[in-house]
Amino acid sequence: AGYLTHAIEEFPVDPKTIYEVVVVGNSTMRDLFFRQSVYTIGQNPYRSITEIEMAEGKRTTTSLIETGRRCLLPVHPDARVYGLPIISGHVGADAAACMLAVGMADEERLVAIMDIGTNTELILGNKHRILAASCPAGPAFEGGAIACGMPGLDGAVEDVMLDESGTFTLGVIGGGIPE
C-alpha cells in the first residue's frame, strides 16, 4: 500500500473516492498481496493455490476479488480490488496484463512478450494460439551457481560477434580483456 499511498499524495484526490483497484504481479507476489498461501508455488506442483482449487472444481477462475478494507488499502473500504488471473505456475497476472495490453487474443499477427526478471516469462501467440513459458533468470543476473563464467560485472563477456572473415570479436563489460 506504500506505493499507492505515495501515488495518492501526488494527485489531488480523496482516496475514499477510489472504488476499483487492479493488482497484477507474478504468481507469488499477487498471491502474497491477497494473503493467499504461496506454499504450493515454491514446490511441486509449482502452482498457485487458486490454480489447484480451479483444477479441483472449487473455483471457476484464478482471479481474486477482495475489498479495499480486507486488503488494508487507503481507498474506499468497499472498493473492489481485482487480482488478474494467473496463466499457469510462474506465468502470472503480470503476464496476463501484458497480453491484455497488446490485445494478443485479437491479433492475426504473431505477438511476442518478454518479461525479464527473477523469473522470465516468454509468451508468443495471436488469436489462434498462445504459448507461454517461464524459467528462472535470477541466477543468470546474480551469478548464482555458475560453474563456468561470472556475474554481469566488469570483465564479463556481453557480446560475441563473428565477422565475414570468421574472426570472433568479444564485447566486454567495462572494456578490456575478458576475465
Per-range role (PLM):
Residues 1-21, 26-112:
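Nucleotide/phosphate-binding catalytic cleft detector across ATP-hydrolyzing
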Residues 39-55, 97-178:
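Glycine-rich phosphate-binding loop of actin/hexokinase-like ATP-binding domains
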